[in-house]
Amino acid sequence: MGRKKIQITRIMDERNRQVTFTKRKFGLMKKAYELSVLCDCEIALIIFNSTNKLFQYASTDMDKVLLKYTEYNEPHESRTNSDIVETLRKKGLNGCDSPDPDADDSVGHSPESEDKYRKINEDIDLMISRQRLCAVPPPNFEMPVSIPVSSHNSLVYSNPVSSLGNPNLLPLAHPSLQRNSMSPGVTHRPPSAGNTGGLMGGDLTSGAGTSAGNGYGNPRNSPGLLVSPGNLNKNMQAKSPPPMNLGMNNRKPDLRVLIPPGSKNTMPSVSEDVDLLLNQRINNSQSAQSLATPVVSVATPTLPGQGMGGYPSAISTTYGTEYSLSSADLSSLSGFNTASALHLGSVTGWQQQHLHNMPPSALSQLGACTSTHLSQSSNLSLPSTQSLNIKSEPVSPPRDRTTTPSRYPQHTRHEAGRSPVDSLSSCSSSYDGSDREDHRNEFHSPIGLTRPSPDERESPSVKRMRLSEGWAT
């Protein structure tokens, strides 16, 4: 490896100049020592630095060498800097350039210096190796975490495949989840009034853990449901149409539900053969699976201007086994083509008023749809006590059948109020009159959550009733 060349000029940096002077002074004395030993001569060095500080070196005694110098009168060799530069030029070397002084100094070649440099080199190599290790990109420690949406012991209303395995668990539904259950994610708008064809739903599934079309779990796997009081009002205030029960659970997978489109003046009629076929299949499915009538307790009411307006703000539904309906009772309930299954518990005076205003074909189809839904889901509402009553005896026929389709008038009233299927679609907004009938009649839902008109909302006849022992008779 070649030596680094430096330019022989005055060093401008004071510190660098001082370091270079100390190093080269020691190198010069080392060379004088080697020369005196190797060649058996006497050498004396006298050095003054830039601050006129004296540094001297003598191979023997300085005074003795200086005495010889003063007494010597014969011709002798005397050189200056210019002579050295000229001699270097003749040898082919540039006088302004010189090898690295570190290579000539004794400091760089002493055993102590070599050990120190060796240690420094080892430290540098170790540091470089550490830097290479640190330069390697760190491994990815991210671990995928899967969060289960539904568990075996939890009920999520927004999950369409959630299951309930623990019959003793009564979960509280989150407001956002309750709002999701009423969202139009599972809804299908029926065709407009101009269309004469009905809305055909998909095949009804019989899965044990699937949910109904309204987002609630299958009652076969959910013996107890508890809805928090503040969430029902949020559902009624949601700006979305109510969901249609197109995915109702049933044991007949080939059964299709025909839901007529909503209109004011034209309601498509269905033949009696289709009605009898639907009722026969519904009765067969209900006889194969008995319906446990729920014991409904009415919770804290809300203000008249909020939520359902005078109706209970939450319904705590528990499934009792002491009251059950047989297939004979359920078949007798279809007196007007199972239209009484719209409200299995009781029908208020306001509800009867609007049920009288509906044509029998619409009532027959609503009964055929809602009875299938009520056979699988027990989300019932019992807001007051009126005519339709069910006794607890399994074989006795029901009493007070006053809501048959033969007693309904064939004309339709639109200015008096809304029908239950129309009032549910307008439950998310303010009940401001009959000017919204043109927009509300196209939504239909068999859910029994209704809302009174403004004139009947303040009526003292509409009262709440707590049912603790059984059904009202």
Curated annotation (Swiss-Prot):
It is linked to Neurodevelopmental disorder with hypotonia, stereotypic hand movements, and impaired language: An autosomal dominant disorder characterized by impaired intellectual development, absent speech, hypotonia, poor eye contact and stereotypic movements. Dysmorphic features include high broad forehead with variable small chin, short nose with anteverted nares, large open mouth, upslanted palpebral fissures and prominent eyebrows. Some patients have seizures. The lineage of its organism: Eukaryota, Metazoa, Chordata, Craniata, Vertebrata. Transcription activator which binds specifically to the MEF2 element present in the regulatory regions of many muscle-specific genes. Controls cardiac morphogenesis and myogenesis, and is also involved in vascular development. Enhances transcriptional activation mediated by SOX18. Plays an essential role in hippocampal-dependent learning and memory by suppressing the number of excitatory synapses and thus regulating basal and evoked synaptic transmission. Crucial for normal neuronal development, distribution, and electrical activity in the neocortex. The beta domain, missing in a number of isoforms, is required for enhancement of transcriptional activity. Residues 58-86 bind DNA. Phosphorylation on Ser-59 enhances DNA binding activity. Phosphorylation on Ser-396 is required for Lys-391 sumoylation and inhibits transcriptional activity. Acetylated by p300 on several sites in diffentiating myocytes. Acetylation on Lys-4 increases DNA binding and transactivation. Keywords: Acetylation, Activator, Apoptosis, Cytoplasm, Developmental protein, Differentiation, Disease variant, DNA-binding, Epilepsy, Intellectual disability, Isopeptide bond, Neurogenesis, Nucleus, Phosphoprotein, Transcription, Transcription regulation, Ubl conjugation. It comes from Homo sapiens (Human). The gene is MEF2C. Residues 419-432 have a biased composition (Low complexity). This is Myocyte-specific enhancer factor 2C. Residues 271-278 are annotated as: Beta domain. Residues 433-443 have a biased composition (Basic and acidic residues). It is found in: Nucleus; Cytoplasm, Sarcoplasm. The modification N6-acetyllysine is found at residues 4, 116, 119, 234, 239, 252, 264. GO terms for cellular component: chromatin; cytoplasm; cytosol; intracellular membrane-bounded organelle; nuclear speck; nucleoplasm; nucleus; postsynapse.
